[in-house]
Amino acid sequence: MTWMRVMPRCQNRTYKRPRGPPLSIHPLEFFQAKKVEKTAKAKMILYYLASIPLAIICYLAWYLHVPWDLPSLPRIPFYVSILGLWSSMGQDEIYERWLRKPLEAHGAVLIWFAGRWSILVTRPDLLTDMFRNEDLYAKAGSQKKIPWSVIATLVGDNIINSHGDTWKLYTGIMKPGLQKKNFDTAPLLLKSRRFVDEILAEQNSAGRGTGILVNTFVQQWAVDVMGMSFLDLDLQSLEKPHGTVRLEAIQSVIKLMLFRPLFFNFPDLDQFAWLIKSRQRAYEIMHEFGDTLMATVLGRIDSDREKGIKPAEEMVVHMLVDAYRDGRLTEKQFKDNLKIVFLTAHENAQQLVNSMFWEIGKNNEVQTRLRAEILSTNTTTPTSEVVNALPYLTAVVYELLRLYPPVSQLINRVTVRPAMLGNEIPIPAGTFVGWNAYGVHVNPAIWGPDANEFKPERWGRTVGEMHARFRRETVRGTYIPFNAHSRKCLGQGFVLLQMKILLFEVLRRIEWTVDPGYRLKMTPVSYFLESGRKSTDA
């Protein structure tokens, strides 16, 4: 067997190690050493590969841990918040399975929402404490919580989620246009008639007895009514071919992008949008919406002013434009408040109308009684005085808002200093708190054993009794479709009128039932139509 000697590259020199003689290796030993070296490298690679999931697990454990200083409340399992990744369960189903019992027993729970553990409240006295103490439980929307996110890019800093002097500035400018005593009902009736025309045409095209989807028409109606009542714009979404009014068509895209469970519950992922093509597109859509809306509004108003055309009535858009032009609002503040008017003034109505078609479509007794009351007026041109005098119509709208609150859950307040909610729940500063309106409204301890039933009669017999209970339950924190106290929705009067006018026209001209394959799905902030069809027969 031949021996070999491993020498350094430098010729004619003997390589001397610091210790021992020059290295001599037998060929067999050499290959064995190489094998050992490869095995060591393989093990090292395996260790590295194993450390990656371990590091991820450790990071998630840190990211998802409940801060030690949060109150000792029942904790809703983290996975409940991300069920949408693999489950089609609606929020009403999720509430019944995981939230109802702890919330009704304790009044508040810890829940994972928008990238952090927050406190969700449903007990009325706790809600009242939170609503009344605006300086302690300050409004803080996505622009404060997750300012880098897609949703923050969409809504920005606006009259709904701002606080302090900024909120006072916005309210001083916008309140007269949002809380008018006498809204013009002509646009409401005009668009409601067009809406009924469109769904009847769709039904005739589909054939009698065949179900049709109405959500597209509902959104078009809601956008058109919003435009004519708040922005001095007739977008004509109902009149023009579907999808040609960009400001309306883009709303469906926005809704789909906002409520993707992964990004909704892990908004930190939006900070890596440069790696995620779908999030890049989401940011583009949000910017397109804001830029298009601002250009459309200013273009219309400037054109009218150049022609000497004065608006028929002062709307919130005119107040915003004046404040922007005289420097009270920055361009961003102007745009953010335009967007929030557009979004809330159409989406809440849209979701409530979807719920209306669902509930009244499967409740023939209510539909028949309501139609009889409407037809008894002997008019086809209802005014605000006419619809506001109808007790059953009023009760139906109130009950729809109770069982189907358009904003079913919202966590957009933060403690500015350590707090003691209801004098019993200690909350550290910087904790986000919110409410679940659906949970409040279906609590049998508040609304009785029939809390889950659609029962308009619970509101009373006369319009006066109904208004009194509406106010009483709102003050108590037991009825919160429009929030309560100083931050209650400024547009609630308009929403009630809008719904009554639409219901009047729909019930006057249409009878309908719900298609057996249709399903209503409840999302964290509103209701959306889910698979299935709605049958509408004239």
From Swiss-Prot:
Keywords: Glycoprotein, Iron, Membrane, Metal-binding, Oxidoreductase, Transmembrane, Transmembrane helix
This protein's GO CC annotations: membrane
Needed co-factor(s): heme
Gene3D superfamilies reported for this sequence: Cytochrome P450 (1.10.630.10)
PANTHER family, sorted: CYTOCHROME P450 (PTHR24305), CYTOCHROME P450-DIT2 (PTHR24305:SF223)
Transmembrane domains' residue ranges: 44-64
Lineage, top ranks: Eukaryota, Fungi, Dikarya, Ascomycota, Pezizomycotina
Family, as annotated: Belongs to the cytochrome P450 family.
UniProt-listed SUPFAM superfamilies: Cytochrome P450
UniProt pathway annotation: Secondary metabolite biosynthesis
Protein name, per record: Cytochrome P450 monooxygenase xanG
Species this chain originates from: Aspergillus fumigatus (strain ATCC MYA-4609 / CBS 101355 / FGSC A1100 / Af293)
Role of this protein: Cytochrome P450 monooxygenase; part of the gene cluster that mediates the biosynthesis of the isocyanide xanthocillin and its derivatives. The first step of the pathway consists in the conversion of tyrosine into a vinyl-isonitrile intermediate by the isocyanide synthase xanB. Subsequent oxidative dimerization of this intermediate to form xanthocillin may involve the cytochrome P450 monooxygenase xanG, whose expression is coregulated with that of XanB.
GO BP annotations, alphabetical order: biosynthetic process
Keyword Hydrolase: no
Main location: membrane
Residues forming coiled coils: none
Membrane topology recorded in Swiss-Prot or TrEMBL: Single-pass membrane protein
Example of a GO MF term: monooxygenase activity
Pfam families attached to this UniProt entry: p450 (PF00067)
Subcellular location as annotated: Membrane
Sites where a glycan is attached: 378
Binding site for heme: 489
EC code(s) of this entry: 1.14.-.-
InterPro entries: Cyt_P450, Cyt_P450_E_grp-IV, Cyt_P450_sf, Cytochrome_P450_monoxygenase
